[in-house]
Amino acid sequence: GLSLESFIRNALVQRTGSHVKLWEFKKQLQKAMEVLQMDPSYAERDLNVGFSGGEKKKSEILQLMMLKPSLAILDETDSGLDVDAVRLASEGIHVYQQENPDSSLLIITHSTKILESLHVDYTHVMVNGHIIATGDASLIEQINREGYEQFKEQM
């Protein structure tokens, strides 16, 4: 199979059009894995083979951190994660934001926990396929205080 490390390295070559020196790539990969508290042995494992749900989510954040896309859509990245894993995923996303300030993220979630340490420019609330509220990070605080019911009533 294809190892996680090989997958990311090949994807990086495809994305950038240039080869990164192996030692430099491994150093960057190790640094990103440390942020996510991933054991270095995960880099050698076959991509998504035998990974738990949490390990797959960490792998996705690792790919985000390494490939540095200008736009990323994170759909339910926090789904099924325990509190510690959500914190680590959020930290990885935060590091990505800091290192790529001109990038854009669309984070789809039912829980606001993953958003707490991130810089949020816009918040949209969607009910039944319709955006019914838009605001800044203060909208997240309002949701945490008052819940989603207030928005469902607007439909």
What residue ranges belong to the model's regions?
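ABC-family P-loop ATPase nucleotide-binding domains
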Residues: 1-70
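Walker B catalytic motif
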Residues: 73-77, 84
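Helical segment within the ABC ATPase nucleotide-binding domain
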Residues: 86-101
